[in-house]
Amino acid sequence: MGFRELIDGSREIDGRVSVNFDMRLESERTGNEPILFREITESPGHSAVMNILTRQRLCEAFEVQPGELIDILSWAMENPSEPILVDGANAPVFENTMDDTDLFSIPIPWHYSEDGGRYQSASIIIAQHGGLRNTSFHRQLVKG
C-alpha cells in the first residue's frame, strides 16, 4: 500500500489550521480518524496528514488480523531479507537541493503545550552498524 492509497478516504480539512496545537485538537475532536489538512498557516503551499498509519490500516495492508500482526513482525525481524537494489534511473525521487534545510518550513505539528516545540511524531530511523540493521520509531523534536 502506497502513501497515496493510505490517504484515500481521509477526511479533508480545507480551512486554515496552525501547526501549533490546531492539528492535534482537530484530530482529537474527530476521534483520531485519518485527516488531510489542505492549508497550513505556517507552511504555505504544503498539506499534511495525521493518523494514516494505524494498526488497523497496517493489518489491512498486510491482509492479516490485528492479533496476528505482532507475530508476523516478530517473524520478519528474525528472518530478514536483503533489499532488492534497482538502478537509480528506475526509481526517481525528489531530492533536497537546498544548501540549508529549514524543517520549520514544513508542517511539523506542536502537539501539546507541555512539549518543548514541534515534534515529528512518527519518525522512522533505519541505522546499520557492524552488519546489524535496526529500525526504530521515534518522536523527534525539531530544534533550531
Which residue ranges define each predicted feature?
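Extended, highly charged
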Residues: M1-G144
